[in-house]
Curated annotation (Swiss-Prot):
Key words, A-Z: Electron transport, Endoplasmic reticulum, Fatty acid biosynthesis, Fatty acid metabolism, Lipid biosynthesis, Lipid metabolism, Membrane, Oxidoreductase, Transmembrane, Transmembrane helix, Transport
The protein's name: Acyl-CoA 6-desaturase
The keyword Kinase appears for this protein: no
Organism: Homo sapiens
Factors inducing expression: Repressed by dietary highly unsaturated fatty acids.
Superkingdom classification of source: Eukaryota
Tissue occurrence: Expressed in a wide array of tissues, highest expression is found in liver followed by brain, lung, heart, and retina. A lower level is found in breast tumor when compared with normal tissues; lowest levels were found in patients with poor prognostic index.
Gene behind the chain: FADS2
Length: 444
């Protein structure tokens, strides 16, 4: 009798009609005050919940009115856990006659990419080699120790100070790549451990904020090189990027700076100032304004440790100048590496591409070598990292041949270049965009 009762209840549940929606209806809900998105053909109303989203409301809001299936899988290593948060937000499904993809996205590419992801999972490419990351942390701590010993043993003369600064800049750059790993949840299986170590590395070892980084970087991954969605291409009118923006600025007669010379003043404004001035100020203000007291405590612990270590050698003012010189050196390293993969690629308004195509359009690789891997924190495999952001970086080279094959199958360009050419392409790209601006400014 109990069994029969259960069957009756199940039949009754199946009779309840699930609301269905067309893409035309879903795409209307793409406002800040009205947000729907689709995951695996199920429709969710995330309007209110997006404020609570751990990755920030902007990154999830960028997919309002769209299919977010591949982005959802890319960012979340534990789908079962995060799926629990989706259940209360479910409002219906795509109508049976509707395609799974919005805006005419290529369903065949999407299908093949999902098969590729399944292959990567079967190859255990999302499994971490913890010794690898322990060695990375150890070599950062070793660099910090060498820096202190240099000034302790040889004194605070110019040569020991310069050597110490370069060693500390190296440790800061490497800590930057390491925090990137933990921030992407690519080291531990449980997100909470990644979050904890992320705060330690970016906070105590670098004096920055995990929440600030998450807010910016996840948007970049979700919509790379898309104006108004990727904060990394918001240049605050200092540079014009790609082809669309310089022409628009030119047509509107916008001339905040002489953009036809941006490939020249880049050397004065870009690499030297990004971290010591813009990022350092923005990070501190973000933590205070948004009351990220935990992040602020971690960051303060870095500054306390630094000044306790180096004030005895340089005094208060000297230690402060020393710190900013280290930031100055690190900033050059950071800017050149992070821009060589993206600034030279297509930068445009939203084109509503599938996940695979959108990442390949916005990213390129640099050839593999031991030095290139170390120097860039394996961001020379930027394509694979963008496709699989939770994949441990030591496995990115293993999936690269399969990504190349998929690109060849669908006629998508897979760009890979030598390191020096990748760096020079940054300047070529800025020069090209500057010329487009000048032409539009004078003639359109």
């Amino acid at each position: 009798m109990g069994k029969g009762g259960n069957q009756g209840e199940g039949a009754a549940e199946r009779e309840v009609s699930v609301p269905t929606f067309s893409w035309e209806e879903i795409q209307k809900h793409n406002l800040r005050t009205d947000r729907w998105l689709v995951i695996d053909r199920k429709v969710y109303n995330i309007t209110k919940w997006s404020i609570q989203h751990p990755g920030g409301q902007r990154v999830i809001g960028h997919y309002a009115g769209e299919d977010a299936t591949d982005a959802f899988r890319a960012f979340h290593p534990d789908l079962e856990f995060v799926g629990k948060f989706l259940k209360p937000l479910l409002i219906g499904e795509l109508a049976p006659e509707e395609p799974s993809q919005d805006h005419g996205k290529n369903s065949k590419i999407t299908e093949d990419f999902r098969a590729l992801r399944k292959t990567a999972e079967d190859m255990n490419l999302f499994k971490t080699n913890h010794v690898f990351f322990l060695l990375l942390l150890a070599h950062i701590i070793a660099l910090e120790s060498i820096a202190w010993f240099t000034v302790f043993y040889f004194g605070n003369g110019w040569i020991p100070t310069l050597i110490t600064a370069f060693v500390l800049a190296t440790s800061q750059a490497q800590a930057g790549w390491l925090q990137h790993d933990y921030g992407h949840l690519s080291v531990y299986r449980k997100p909470k451990w990644n979050h904890l170590v992320h705060k330690f590395v970016i906070g105590h070892l670098k004096g920055a904020s995990a929440n600030w980084w998450n807010h910016r970087h996840f948007q970049h991954h979700a919509k790379p090189n898309i104006f108004h969605k990727d904060p990394d291409v918001n240049m605050l009118h200092v540079f014009v990027l790609g082809e669309w923006q310089p022409i628009e600025y030119g047509k509107k007669k916008l001339k905040y700076l002489p953009y036809n010379h941006q490939h020249e003043y880049f050397f004065l404004i870009g690499p030297p100032l990004l971290i010591p001035m813009y990022f350092q100020y923005q990070i501190i203000m973000t933590m205070i304004v948004h009351k990220n007291w935990v992040d602020l405590a971690w960051a303060v612990s870095y500054y306390i440790r630094f000044f306790i270590t180096y004030i005895p050698f340089y005094g208060i003012l000297g230690a402060l100048l020393f710190l900013n010189f280290i930031r100055f050196l690190e900033s050059h390293w950071f800017v050149w590496v992070t821009q060589m993969n993206h600034i030279v690629m297509e930068i445009d308004q939203e084109a509503y591409r599938d996940w695979f195509s959108s990442q390949l359009t916005a990213t390129c690789n640099v050839e593999q070598s031991f030095f290139n891997d170390w120097f860039s924190g394996h961001l020379n495999f930027q394509i694979e990292h963008h496709l699989f952001p939770t994949m441990p970086r030591h496995n990115l080279h293993k999936i690269a041949p399969l990504v190349k094959s998929l690109c060849a199958k669908h006629g998508i360009e897979y760009q890979e270049k030598p390191l020096l050419r990748a760096l020079l392409d940054i300047i070529r790209s800025l020069k090209k965009s500057g010329k487009l601006w000048l032409d539009a400014y004078l003639h359109k």
